[in-house]
Amino acid sequence: MFQTQSRRATSTRAVEALYATGHWLLSQERIAQAIVVFRAMIHVAPHDERGWLALGACHEAREQHSIALELYGAASEVARSTPRCDLARARILRSRGQSQEAIDAIEQAALVAERTKDEDLQSLVDAERRRA
């Protein structure tokens, strides 16, 4: 049992280190390196929405919106709950003129915000609704 807890703690620390490193690289506009780190993160922790969201953001920074859209969609298939990926997906869909699909993505995020009573997420949903 102790070994399992120790492995979990190590895994959690590794995921946090990957996220922090990738985020720092992204903030330094070292996009190619950040992509490598976030790919590793989604491999190690596929259920962590942050890796998918950050990897998508890297591709958006490179103007690779189709890849970002695919990543945000894949996140919803792999991770348990991906409301922030849904909002990012809505933003891209709206920019492509796919208004109904964008609204659907926003509403998926809204359901999670209501269920979890996450005020920050609700604020993001409200902002996207105003843009829609």
Language model features with spans:
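Alpha-helical segment of the N-proximal tetratricopeptide repeat
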Residues: T12-H43
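TPR/TPR-like (Sel1-like) alpha-helical repeat modules
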Residues: E77, R94-K117, R130
